[in-house]
């Protein structure tokens, strides 16, 4: 298992920034990024920007706060991987295994599997869909103690 890389999905980044019940757990994970390099497939950039734009659109954030959130996301220093055909095939296989119509989550799974590293999510639906698979490299953010401010 690769210990210097960790895959995080967009839900972790967004829930670390926007107020929600998992924020302190996500912030605890973000604190570990001094020890490990966070990484994600290229769609992470689109998903985080879209979530922040949606928060501004629905008045959860002001436009200025949205711009600050984009800066916070950028400051995470994510290593972005552009999927190749092997990643596409692996994502397709994960999508079929999960019995889903879209492959977004599957690209995170495929990347973690390919790079042989841990994958952290704050997406309960995704985590629950794979809980019975007992994937040692799949982690739910509440496994970490919340960050106390």
Feature map (PLM): residue ranges:
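Active-site neighborhoods of divalent-metal-dependent phosphate/nucleic-acid chemistry enzymes
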Residues: 78-122
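Short, well-structured N-terminal submotif of metal-dependent ribonuclease cores
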Residues: 1-43, 55, 60-67, 147-148
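Amphipathic alpha-helical segments within well-ordered protein domains
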Residues: 30, 49, 53, 92-95, ...
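Structured helix-beta-strand junction loops
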Residues: 33-36, 76, 115
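Alpha-helix capping/helix-boundary segments
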Residues: 12-13, 44, 87, 107-108, ...
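Phosphate- and divalent-cation-binding pockets in alpha/beta enzyme and binding domains
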Residues: 25, 47, 90, 128-129
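Acidic, PIN/NYN-like endoribonuclease modules and their adjacent C-terminal/linker elements
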Residues: 1-5, 97, 109-149
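Active-site-proximal, substrate-binding regions of enzyme catalytic domains
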Residues: 43, 49-79, 88-91
